[in-house]
């Protein structure tokens, strides 16, 4: 699929998610249309914005994600370093995020690249995710 078509499809799904006012319906829409790497059962997804690399997000069962949670699955510091040092040796970094069963993620949390949030965790609002269980 061409890059332009992918962008159009992503915009379409973003608008459709905005129309799903309720978090359980959003999670169901994400699961039904395979927008993430995976979306488990009985999930709640309230963020308004779609992650940049949604295929790198894996959410297990009974996960509740509050509003204004941001998923970051890439790091573009390579652009800065390659320009500064006039090289191409610094590579673009992406990593998947996995959220295991029975997790609550509070409002305003930032989930950083490559993080795994273990089962039965509560991540308080406004935090940057740490590996494991907070």
Task: Describe the role of every protein-language-model region.
Residues 20, 34-37, 103-105, 111, ...:
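Generic detector of intrinsically disordered, low-complexity, polar/charged segments
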Residues 26, 45-117, 132-133:
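Flexible, glycine/small-residue-enriched loop-and-beta-strand segment within the central core
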Residues 1-42, 77-78, 120:
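Terminal amphipathic alpha-helical/low-complexity segments used for targeting or macromolecular assembly
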Residues 7-10, 115-130:
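C-terminal/domain-terminus segments
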């Amino acid at each position: 699929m061409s890059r332009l078509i992918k962008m159009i499809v992503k915009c379409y799904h973003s608008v459709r998610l905005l129309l799903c006012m309720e978090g359980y319906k959003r999670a169901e829409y994400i699961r039904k249309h395979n927008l993430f790497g995976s979306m488990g059962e009985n999930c709640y997804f309230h963020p308004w914005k779609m992650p940049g690399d949604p295929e790198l997000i894996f959410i297990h069962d009974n996960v509740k994600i509050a509003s204004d949670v941001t998923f970051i699955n890439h790091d573009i510091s390579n652009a800065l370093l390659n320009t500064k040092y006039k090289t191409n040796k610094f590579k673009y970094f992406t990593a998947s995020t996995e959220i295991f069963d029975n997790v609550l993620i509070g409002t305003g949390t930032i989930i950083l690249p490559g993080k795994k949030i273990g089962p039965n965790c509560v991540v308080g609002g406004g935090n940057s995710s740490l590996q494991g269980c907070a």
